[in-house]
Amino acid sequence: MIPVDNHLHSRLCGHATGEVGAYISQAVRLGIKEVGFCDHLPLYFLPPDKMIPDYAMNEDELPGYVNMIRKLADQAPLQVKLGIEADFIPGQEEKLAAMLAPHKFDFITGSVHFIDGWGFDNPAERAEYARRDIDTIYQRYFALAQQAAQTGLFDIMAHPDLIKKFNYRPHQDPRPLYEETARVFKNAGVCVEVNSAGLRYPVQEIYPGPELLQIFFAHGLPVTLGSDAHRPEDVGAGLPQALELIRSVGYREVATFSNQQIKFVSI
């Protein structure tokens, strides 16, 4: 039994397919007890003429997204929560807070997809890895993830080692980065997303991997589950493996959210 899938997208982001009702139907078929829609927040950090096509909803679509998911929650045969995935860009925290403030989300998920303007998880920008030092990339990525958690704007930190997506691994031992990230996350009071989407990409591994997840457990960080579904058929995909991983390191419960308040479900 999958207790929750807290990371579903919608067509509003421009790179997902299917109606939200189809995502719900798939969740019901799989026996998932609760889902959270977590679509991409508009790109608050870019001027209107510099927007990235098919990356996130437009700013004028955000109220409609909120209303759509709230209406869906009233009608669906399972628990549906309203979340949002917000990119962290250092120096843009006030703009981010201002965009989030008018809406009552059940949870706000923070993510890092850009390193100083480089969309490192975009296949179109993958060649940039060959032009940079991989250890420096990892250091910068985890520094940004730590800064994001410290803003206090996020309930959940998404796919915490997304930097490994294309299976480029650091030469240096990453454990010091992992330990420091766990300490910062714990002090910030965030929950970690165990995200199964990595199984669908070259890395072929859940985010976070076993070593990092073990460190998160040792630091007492709570976890939640997310498939990062951009198609109805990806709802719940890989979450049985994610649950197995979670249990293997010692977790016996996962987090759910309502009105940005955390609750726990036994697994």
Describe each PLM feature range.
Residues 1-90, 95, 99-100, 164-167, ...:
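An N-terminally biased module of ancient metal coordination in phosphate/nucleic-acid-related enzymes
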Residues 7, 27, 108, 159, ...:
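Conserved, mostly hydrophobic/aromatic
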Residues 12, 111-219:
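Domain-core and long-helix interface of multi-subunit machines
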Residues 30, 103, 151-152, 219, ...:
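Structural motif
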Residues 33-34, 38, 106, 155, ...:
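Short acidic/polar active-site loop segments enriched in Thr and Asp
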Residues 37, 110, 159, 194, ...:
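Conserved beta-strand positions
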Residues 85-129:
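Hydrophobic alpha-helical segments and helix pairs
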Residues 209-267:
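Long, positively charged, glycine-interspersed low-complexity recognition regions
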